[in-house]
């Protein structure tokens, strides 16, 4: 029988209330042992009481709710204790429950038990974590549909359809001398399944980018003001700023919110030819970050003419989406605009700013939003994790292989095997086929108490 687990479910800190959650077969027994008054309980009804410690001293006035198995979040007997939201009082109640036999919960253990007890599948479990971590309204909307079970519902229906198709194929295989099903119908059902998967996957990469934060990479040669720009955009000192070129050697990643859209802003080492081994590593990382970014802010220094280092950087990013940012316009402007236009071409966005004086920053933010509009707009759908994407893409490939085998009139057991492999990918997506390692990876980053 699983241990009875306990954890604080609300953020640690001072607030109006804290919630302590306990799940397992001994939940009510342990709870009774710490309550001042013996109470007759009704499931899902809050009641008033006091929590006492082992010597009978009252710790706090509380409200308690009991959830009877299987009608609870975890599918087990569950208790929620709502106490005053102080750090000391909440921890004291938690310690008292542990001293009476409850075990401190691991990260995500309540949701893991909900999955293992059949209350949710893995798509819903992932949605729980994502809605807690969502940093923008757009991401909340994307994830909420899966929390309500939309992706799960669609994929379960797809699974049922494929099971029916597999049954038709296996009947043909078992009775080869009889024509029991129109071959065209089998092929059509497989094609329809592929079309359905493609509809689910449509714009999925954009949704994954949006949910994790659109990557905006700041690049340029040393001492052009990249770190100052990062600090100005995030409105705090996150990167070290000095007049010494090459101060930034490693990537600095900072979350940024603009108009409710979540970004990850990345400051990089200045790109130039160098014999310094550490600086060379920083330059390599900067180039790699630019290659992986969704948008580049290419920073030029208004106080120095465009040189070969600038041109080299431009050659590295010319296939990417980028904005040219001329910084330090509060000082002497030595950049020849006509020469710059020849180098960049006429369609390149060029903005002038002073990161130090915070001039032109609002216009830059507006241009950033405009530049990623395609990512922001094309986000309808339900795929919100790379794991979901990969299993559905695998399912699509296996179904395509089954159609090819069918068209080539290969033995029907080969066609059936491909459909079974497609179903296997769906089972892994939903979690009906899982390993402990997979669950560990999914739940390890959950907060304790969820």
Curated annotation (Swiss-Prot):
Species of the source: Pseudothermotoga lettingae (strain ATCC BAA-301 / DSM 14385 / NBRC 107922 / TMO)
InterPro entries: G_TrmE, GTP-bd, GTP-bd_TrmE_N, GTPase_MnmE, MnmE_dom2, MnmE_helical, P-loop_NTPase, Small_GTP-bd
E.C. number: 3.6.-.-
Ranges annotated as spanning the membrane: none
GO molecular function list: GTP binding; GTPase activity; metal ion binding
Family recorded in the similarity comment: Belongs to the TRAFAC class TrmE-Era-EngA-EngB-Septin-like GTPase superfamily. TrmE GTPase family.
Record GO biological process: tRNA methylation; tRNA wobble uridine modification
Localisation: Cytoplasm
Binding site for K(+): 223, 242, 244, 247
Protein name listed in UniProt: tRNA modification GTPase MnmE
Cellular-component GO terms for this entry: cytosol
List of residues binding Mg(2+): 227, 248
CC cofactor note: Binds 1 potassium ion per subunit.
Functional summary from the UniProt entry: Exhibits a very high intrinsic GTPase hydrolysis rate. Involved in the addition of a carboxymethylaminomethyl (cmnm) group at the wobble position (U34) of certain tRNAs, forming tRNA-cmnm(5)s(2)U34.
Pfam family membership, one: MMR_HSR1
